[in-house]
């Protein structure tokens, strides 16, 4: 099975410009290819991982990746399928975000070894050197307005209004391909399926300006079995930066993937072989309640993104919280595992009597209910049942002198911080 066949088998090929020519190029020698990442935030997220890992698979097959950080295009904003114009960021912000994205990409691509080691480029380096007049004369003249307006990515915005700034975005992305081809002999661009219009602008410019053929391959935009956009949890993006999304949160995200998605995601997001995935699928289908596919997915992706130690910590937090063994975890681990739990900052004037604190922290709606909860054995302090109505919290109840965990029943938590 050649690399293109494997990508197809993993569900990673959505559309190509000329499949036969692309397969021929990939099987006959080393291909230099690139994927672009606009710095629209200070971190990449799970949605970016599809293209990043596809790029890594091609590198492992002997091809040479170029990771393009859009320091210039990030200043403009891609209008593709957006309902409204993006808020323009300052140059300083985009520069800072560009640097952070560079650092993240180095975790996935090999920038150090072999003749096909990855290269990092920033399109600000060339766009900052081109005058507006030269850009219009040398690049703009190759694009007709009819061609630019025909792109599905901007048709919707034409109806509601689009600035010239965003309208010109596809020409800038097209020039990226031309520049990388001229300087590095890059002949293939990889990106999300929503980028098709911008990406083919590059092959158009290559054909008209240099009389060369470029290839485009898009990866699918991933949705779950219900059709919901992938990569978000409770409406929040799952970031690759551990400071924005903890390894535990990422672990839980994968652990809660639906059965109908789990095996498909193993093919897309892990480097397990297709034979290994087939064996997992067989075991998974025989006992879905054991969630083997989800557990494997969580292990593989968290280890890939954050490392083995972070995976082991996420697994330990999961197991200890499930067992109610709060005292087996550090304050730092509890902050990860209980990040979505209501947090109450204890004030100097607060009563530390347990009945009062249950009401103050929002665990029980009233003192009467708090007393009943205690008497019925429904209250747990740092994982241990508490029934003493006269109990007062002390420094001994603070884990690492930072926090106390109170639970009512099985699921209602509050974290007290000091």
UniProtKB/Swiss-Prot annotation:
Record-listed L-tyrosine binding positions: 34, 169, 173
CDD domains reported for this sequence: S4 (cd00165), TyrRS_core (cd00805)
S4 RNA-binding domain ranges (all copies): 352-418
GO BP: tyrosyl-tRNA aminoacylation
Enzyme Commission number(s) of this protein: 6.1.1.1
Keywords, ordered alphabetically: Aminoacyl-tRNA synthetase, ATP-binding, Cytoplasm, Ligase, Nucleotide-binding, Protein biosynthesis, RNA-binding
Family from the record: Belongs to the class-I aminoacyl-tRNA synthetase family. TyrS type 1 subfamily.
Function: Catalyzes the attachment of tyrosine to tRNA(Tyr) in a two-step reaction: tyrosine is first activated by ATP to form Tyr-AMP and then transferred to the acceptor end of tRNA(Tyr).
PANTHER family per UniProt: TYROSINE--TRNA LIGASE, MITOCHONDRIAL, TYROSYL-TRNA SYNTHETASE
Record's subunit section: Homodimer.
Protein name per Swiss-Prot or TrEMBL: Tyrosine--tRNA ligase
Lineage: Bacteria, Bacillati, Bacillota, Bacilli, Lactobacillales
């Amino acid at each position: 099975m050649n690399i293109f066949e494997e990508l197809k088998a993993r569900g990673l090929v959505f559309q190509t410009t000329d499949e036969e020519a692309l397969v021929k190029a990939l099987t006959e020698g080393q291909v230099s290819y690139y994927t672009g990442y606009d710095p629209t935030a200070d971190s990449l997220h799970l949605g970016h991982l599809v293209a990043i890992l596809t790029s890594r698979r091609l590198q492992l097959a002997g091809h040479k990746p170029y990771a393009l950080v859009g320091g210039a295009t990030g200043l403009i904003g891609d209008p593709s399928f957006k309902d409204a114009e993006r808020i323009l960021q300052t140059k300083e912000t985009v520069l800072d975000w560009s640097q952070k994205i560079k650092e993240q990409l180095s975790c996935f691509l090999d920038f150090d070894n072999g003749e096909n080691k990855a290269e990092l480029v920033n399109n600000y380096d060339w766009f900052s050197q081109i005058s507006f007049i030269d850009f219009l004369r040398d690049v703009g003249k190759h694009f007709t307005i009819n061609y630019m307006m025909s792109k599905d990515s901007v048709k919707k915005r034409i109806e509601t209004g689009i600035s010239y700034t965003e309208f010109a975005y596809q020409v800038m992305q097209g020039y990226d391909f031309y520049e990388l081809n001229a300087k590095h002999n890059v002949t293939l661009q990889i990106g999300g399926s929503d980028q098709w219009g911008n990406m083919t602008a590059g092959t158009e410019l290559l054909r008209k300006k240099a009389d060369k053929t470029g290839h485009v391959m898009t990866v699918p935009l991933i949705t779950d079995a219900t059709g919901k956009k992938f990569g978000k949890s409770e409406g929040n993006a799952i970031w690759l930066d551990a400071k924005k999304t903890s390894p535990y949160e990422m672990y839980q995200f994968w652990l809660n993937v639906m059965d109908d998605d789990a095996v498909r995601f193993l093919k897309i997001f892990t480097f397990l072989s297709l034979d290994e995935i087939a064996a997992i699928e067989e075991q998974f289908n025989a006992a879905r309640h054991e969630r083997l596919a989800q557990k494997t997915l969580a292990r593989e992706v968290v280890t890939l993104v954050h490392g083995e130690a972070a995976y082991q910590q996420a697994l330990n937090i999961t197991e200890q919280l499930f067992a109610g063994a709060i005292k087996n975890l550090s304050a730092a681990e509890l902050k990860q595992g209980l990040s979505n739990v209501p947090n109450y900052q204890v004030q100097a004037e607060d009563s530390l009597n347990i009945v009062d604190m249950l009401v103050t922290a929002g665990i029980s709606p009233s003192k009467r209910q708090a007393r009943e909860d205690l008497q019925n054995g429904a209250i747990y302090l740092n994982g241990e049942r508490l029934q003493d109505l006269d109990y007062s919290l002390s420094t001994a109840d603070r884990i690492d002198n930072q926090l106390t965990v109170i639970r009512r029943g099985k699921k209602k938590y509050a974290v007290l911080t000091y």
